[in-house]
């Protein structure tokens, strides 16, 4: 049945994704709602809320404000809040209410800029899409507004040694330590400085607010770690000539050591991490086999509940919409190994039971044919990898 959820909780909407991108940048983030959407962001969709400050506000829309289109009241609230806080910009994030009444975000942004005397960006999310759509809009708007185009392009020597990392959010990586790990990876493996836009820079490199975004044209290459950041990477390539690579550099920690040769495998995650896990498994299969002339690779399918970019997909990759889609896929394809969020474990078990096949829940019970391996995705379960490890300990 369309839209019926018996196993999975609702996924984070687009406004949550937009907030996730902007959360650490030192701006005043106003969610244009009556209060409920902001409560969901703070309570469920943004794990940094419990340990890291951000100026995140609800517009506190009342019924008559929405019906009569009293945008001036929102402007007054923003002016008052901005005057009491040390913020560098204001971001207005859309929700279903302004979408229904047809709010003109560009006009609202101009009204605010005149009063605030600081940059104002608006993200026209409507609460009807998933988190990655909001992230994609926020990444694009961020660099369109703040990346300094007036500066002359630096020559390659001045750019050498700096790598930008696009797409890092807790929703996508499920790991609050991912920025630190990625910086260490590029420093140790390539001797280069990784600039993790929008996540982990305040603590890791003591760089605050929009400093990195303004100098986005001063890196030699961008690394794209989620499909939501691909459009921004293309924009930066067009604007500054900065090439990009789509990968997840610390993927090795997501793939446990076991024999994958000849296995039929399903990976369910966001598309870039799923692709990186597939490439890592293939690399390990080839390394174990040792003979490139012998094809002992696993047969691997990547699937996702979220955006699947055609240019990043292989033949047979799948975009999931309903729980029944997933269960039917597992029943029909009879995978040896499934990588997915733990929230999907019971659903996978039930799919195998319906098919009348055996099942092994432990990733290390390699004697059994069918194996489920935890691949935590915060956007699916609202759990971080650190949380899942603590539960297992």
Stretch-by-stretch model annotation:
Residues 1-393:
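An N-terminal assembly and electron-transfer interface module characteristic of large anaerobic redox
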């Amino acid at each position: 049945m369309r839209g019926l959820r018996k196993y999975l909780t609702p996924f984070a909407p687009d406004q949550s994704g937009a907030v996730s991108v902007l959360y650490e940048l030192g701006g005043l983030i106003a969610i244009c709602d009556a209060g409920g959407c902001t409560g969901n962001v703070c309570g469920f969709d943004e794990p940094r809320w419990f340990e890291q400050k951000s100026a995140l506000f609800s517009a506190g829309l009342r019924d008559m404000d929405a019906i009569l289109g009293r945008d001036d009241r929102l402007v007054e609230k923003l002016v008052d809040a901005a005057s009491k806080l040390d913020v560098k910009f204001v971001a207005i994030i859309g929700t279903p209410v302004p979408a229904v009444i047809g709010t003109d975000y560009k006009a609202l942004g101009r009204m605010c800029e005149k009063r605030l005397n600081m940059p104002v960006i608006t993200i026209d999310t409507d609460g009807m899409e998933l988190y990655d759509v909001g992230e994609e809009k926020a990444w694009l708007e961020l660099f369109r507004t703040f990346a300094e185009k007036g500066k002359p392009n630096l020559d390659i020597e001045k750019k050498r040694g700096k790598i930008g990392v696009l797409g890092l959010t807790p929703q996508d990586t499920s790991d609050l330590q991912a920025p630190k790990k990625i910086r260490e990876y590029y420093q140790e493996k390539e001797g280069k400085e990784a600039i993790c836009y929008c996540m982990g820079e305040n603590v890791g490199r003591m760089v605050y607010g929009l400093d990195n975004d303004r100098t986005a044209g001063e890196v030699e290459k961008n690394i794209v770690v989620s499909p939501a950041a691909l459009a921004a990477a293309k924009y930066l390539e067009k604007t500054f000539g900065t090439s990009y690579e789509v990968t997840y550099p610390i993927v090795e920690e997501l793939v446990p050591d076991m024999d994958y040769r000849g296995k039929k495998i399903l990976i369910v995650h966001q598309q870039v991490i799923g692709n990186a896990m597939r490439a890592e498994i293939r690399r390990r299969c080839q390394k174990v086999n040792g003979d490139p002339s012998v094809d002992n690779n696993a047969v691997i399918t990547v699937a996702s509940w979220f955006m699947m970019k055609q240019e990043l997909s292989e033949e047979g990759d799948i975009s999931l919409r309903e729980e029944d889609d997933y269960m039917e896929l597992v029943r029909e394809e009879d995978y040896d190994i499934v990588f997915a969020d733990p929230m999907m474990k019971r659903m996978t078990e039930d799919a195998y039971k319906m098919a009348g096949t055996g099942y092994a829940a432990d990733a290390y019970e390699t004697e059994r044919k069918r194996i489920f391996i935890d691949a935590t995705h915060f956007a699916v379960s609202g759990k971080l990898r650190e949380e899942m490890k603590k539960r297992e300990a």
